[in-house]
Design a protein with these regions (language model features):
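Feature marking well-ordered beta-strand scaffolds used for ligand recognition
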Residues: 1-143
Length: 143
């Protein structure tokens, strides 16, 4: 995690957090990283690339508002293969995950109070799912 100085444009490393288990030996890379709409939690996904040791996960990290450090709270599945991108809905009630290699867009419940990702609300086949853009049909706040 880094602090950004908006006056100078500089980044300063604050903390490095290891998401993978110490004994993990498979191939895995980072996918997406973003904050919850209220800025209380940081979310990060990893991609394991179809290996038996694959590690397609989404991690929830609590942000310390005093110093910007984070602590892993929990991790869970992305409900597909090779997550590329995720987005919260503008109201913060749902989290959408695009899983590229399983060609799916997953919609999950999200509880902003606890930072907990809930049950699957919808699962849609989307060939080459890789990017998500959410447009508010009421004409407000595209994400």
């Amino acid at each position: 995690c880094c602090q950004f100085n908006s006056k100078t444009g500089e980044l300063t490393e604050v903390q490095c957090v290891e998401l993978l288990p110490e004994d993990f030996m498979g191939e895995c890379i980072a996918a997406e990283i973003d904050c919850s709409p209220d800025g209380a939690y940081l979310f990060a996904t990893t991609r394991g690339y179809y290996t038996s040791e694959g590690y397609d996960r989404i991690f929830t990290l609590k942000i310390n508002p005093d110093d910007g450090t984070v602590n892993i709270v929990r991790d869970g599945p992305t409900w597909g293969v090779c997550p590329r991108m995720f987005k919260f809905t503008p109201d913060g009630k749902f989290l959408l995950i695009a899983n590229q290699f399983s060609d799916e867009l997953i919609v999950l419940q999200y509880d902003a109070t606890s930072g907990r990702i809930g049950e699957i609300c919808a699962r849609e086949n989307v060939p080459y799912a890789g990017a998500i853009c959410i447009v508010d049909t009421q004409g407000e706040n595209p994400v």
